[in-house]
């Protein structure tokens, strides 16, 4: 005797394939389950993700929220004294332009902060107001 709890869905391999276009009594005859006219009836049609039948989709009906300030933010980069030792010679001038030319900073960078890490062996000339020195670097420069 078969009990309800033992019934199972046939696995995809055993499931009967849908025969299309084989007469009206099959349930999938004539238009082969595609309906009459419209995008879905055409060959090669795939419904786009989020498509809602021509109406304005949900992702366009819902208002956008918030504001990103990223476009307008000033780009600030950090450089260590250790790195400056390897890039500049003694008595050289340090400015945003020289840092950009030597590809130390990105070309869109508008400010640089110099951080104390290791010793600064060379005496450098700080030209640009956009280059900010940390307290540790300021005290190091005064001692040199």
UniProtKB/Swiss-Prot annotation:
It comes from the Bacteria. Residues 1-48 are annotated as: Disordered. GO terms for biological process: translation. Signal peptide: none annotated. Keywords: Ribonucleoprotein, Ribosomal protein, RNA-binding, rRNA-binding. The keyword Magnesium does not apply. One of its GO terms (cellular component) is cytosolic large ribosomal subunit. GO terms for molecular function: rRNA binding; structural constituent of ribosome. InterPro entries: Ribosomal_uL15, Ribosomal_uL15/eL18_sf, Ribosomal_uL15_bac-type. Binds to the 23S rRNA. Belongs to the universal ribosomal protein uL15 family. Part of the 50S ribosomal subunit. This is Large ribosomal subunit protein uL15. It comes from Chlamydia muridarum (strain MoPn / Nigg). The lineage of its organism: Bacteria, Pseudomonadati, Chlamydiota, Chlamydiia, Chlamydiales.
